[in-house]
Amino acid sequence: MLRDKFIHYFQQWRERQLSRGEHWLAQHLAGRSPREKGMLLAAVVFLFSVGYYVLIWQPLSERIEQQETILQQLVAMNTRLKNAAPDIIAARKSATTTPAQVSRVISDSASAHSVVIRRIADRGENIQVWIEPVVFNDLLKWLNALDEKYALRVTQIDVSAAEKPGMVNVQRLEFGRG
């Protein structure tokens, strides 16, 4: 019932607004010649078309072109990365192949990360390393660098706290190819 009243009042309001608009339009066009009416109609159509083009069509077209360009760039980058991935993985794995090369990489990177190596031994597929007590954060940085740069992963490690805070004793450390 309330809904019906609302609909009825809305329809009455709409009819009044339409009749006012028709009255205003008829009043302005009443004294005009047919030629002026045609020119006014053409001007209204022209202004509407220009407004539509400037406010809606052109910004949408530019945005679509930008998105297409970004999409093409992303597709090209994706293709390059997919093509480069096997080469990168192969280069990482083949960077250190012989035990002598692996030992050299381990010792060079250890000195760069403040890790002192006591002994390195070849254990078939793996390399076992004995090191002096080391700062825990330095040990983590060194192990992370070996993993990221040379694909050498820790296969076994035994760590215990040293007497000094922040220092650790590494009883057993073994690397394998990742």
UniProtKB/Swiss-Prot annotation:
Residues 1-39 are cytoplasmic. One of its GO terms (cellular component) is plasma membrane. It holds the Pfam family T2SSM. One of its GO terms (biological process) is protein secretion by the type II secretion system. It is a single-pass membrane protein. Involved in a type II secretion system (T2SS, formerly general secretion pathway, GSP) for the export of folded proteins across the outer membrane. NCBIfam families: PRK09731.1. In many other E.coli strains this gene is part of a type II secretion system, but in MG1655 the locus is missing a number of genes. This is Putative type II secretion system M-type protein YghD. It comes from Escherichia coli (strain K12).
